[in-house]
Amino acid sequence: MKILFDFLPIALFFGMFKYAEGHKDWAAGLATDWLGFMVSGGVVGPAEAPVLLATVVVIVATLAQILWLKARGRKVDTMLWVSLALVTALGSATIYFHSESFIKWKPTVLYWVMGASLLVGELVFKKNGIKSLMGAQMSLPDAVWRKVNFSWVAFFAAMGCLNLWVAFNFPTSTWVNFKLFGGMGLMLVFVLAQAFFLNKHIKPDTTS
């Protein structure tokens, strides 16, 4: 359920982009009416309207996630705060400058921040981030936890690079498809691979 919650802003970004892409004149009019005061020149063209409207939607959706968690008295993950900061800063630049290049960097920066936090935690603070998250559910040798931690670092680094490659070498519509389906699909494949790896190394329960 949490993974669906985490992917909700991406799904809404995808939905708004695809709808606006199919109704560009309507999207341009709406974006000019609602965002004209925020954009350079005051007018949004049909070509740029879909990504600008989708950017507004993803900012609002990410903020709504945090407000919903706060209203229910739940802890807001640090990465969700980071995501809100990134999407607000890069999204605002995208809207003002009429340039999708800024928002295209958001997934990459977020992937690299997550990877860097795991790497710094392991090398500098001697704290394994993945073990902290999963250690209560399974018992593994420290050497295995390190391998798992570094594999996530490598995965996040690779995903950040892959996002940039798709974003700046293919049409924006292709990047939007990759952002939802490619990102989710690769994450699922990686998690399944991790599950098989962990299953081989789980220590047997000898307490019974």
From Swiss-Prot:
Subcellular location: Cell inner membrane
Membrane-spanning ranges: 49-69, 78-98, 105-125, 150-170, 178-198
Pfam families, sorted: IspA
Keywords, in A-Z order: Cell inner membrane, Cell membrane, Membrane, Transmembrane, Transmembrane helix
Its membrane topology: Multi-pass membrane protein
Described function: Plays a role in cell envelope biogenesis, maintenance of cell envelope integrity and membrane homeostasis.
Record NCBIfam families: PRK00259.1-3
Record-stated family: Belongs to the YciB family.
Protein name: Inner membrane-spanning protein YciB
Species of provenance: Polaromonas naphthalenivorans (strain CJ2)
Gene: yciB
